[in-house]
Amino acid sequence: GFPWGTYNGGKASGTVWYDNVKVTPAPEEALYTREGEHIVLKLDRDKVTVSDADIDAWLSKLDRTYEAYRDLVGDVPFDGRKIMILNTPGIEPGYWALAGNPILWNSHVAVSKLLDRTVEFGDWGFGIIHEIGHVFSQGNISGTGRWNWNDEIFANFRMSYALEACDGTMSQR
C-alpha cells in the first residue's frame, strides 16, 4: 500500500484475518485482450466500443510511446516485461488510473470515451500515456518504487517528449 495513507489520510496497521473471502476469476469471455510489442491491454469487453483494428492502431501508438520513453530515460521498467493495462472496478474513488504493472484503469472512468476519441480525433490518450510516463520514473525503473508529487509534472514532461518524438496527437476536446 501507500506509506502515506489513502486519499482521505487514513493509515491502517496491524493484522486482520478474513475467513469468508472468495476469489472468483472473471470469465475469459468478459475480458477483451489485445497485445502489442510492449503493452498488453485487458479491458472489460463491454467497454470496448471500437474495432480490433482501431485497438491495434492505438496499441501501436502506445508501443511507440514506450520506445520514446526508453530513448529518453535510457532504460525500461520491469526488466523489459510487457506492461499490462487492466480495467478494474476496485481502485480508490477519485483515481482515473494507477501506474505500475499492471496499470490499473478504473472501469468507471472514461474507458469507452477514450477509445472513441482515439478513433474520432486521432487522440493518443492522455491518461494512459501519463500513467506509462510514471512507469518510466527512476523510482519504478530502479525498483525502489519511490514516488513524489514532482513526478506528476515529470510524467507529463515525458509524455510531451514522446508525443513530439512520435508526432503524436493529444486532443484538447
Model-derived segments and spans:
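Low-complexity, Pro/Thr/Ser/Gly/Ala-rich linker/spacer regions in secreted
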Residues: 22-33
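Active-site-proximal structural scaffolding
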Residues: 14, 62, 148-152
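Structural helix-adjacent loops and short alpha-helical linkers that scaffold large soluble proteins
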Residues: 11, 53, 76-78, 122, ...
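Juxtacatalytic substrate-recognition/specificity segment
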Residues: 32-135, 139-140
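Extracellular beta-strand ligand-recognition surfaces/modules
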Residues: 1-21
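Post-HExxH zinc-binding segment in Zn-dependent metallohydrolases
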Residues: 146-173
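Residues that line or immediately flank small-molecule/substrate-binding pockets and catalytic motifs
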Residues: 4, 25, 139-140, 157
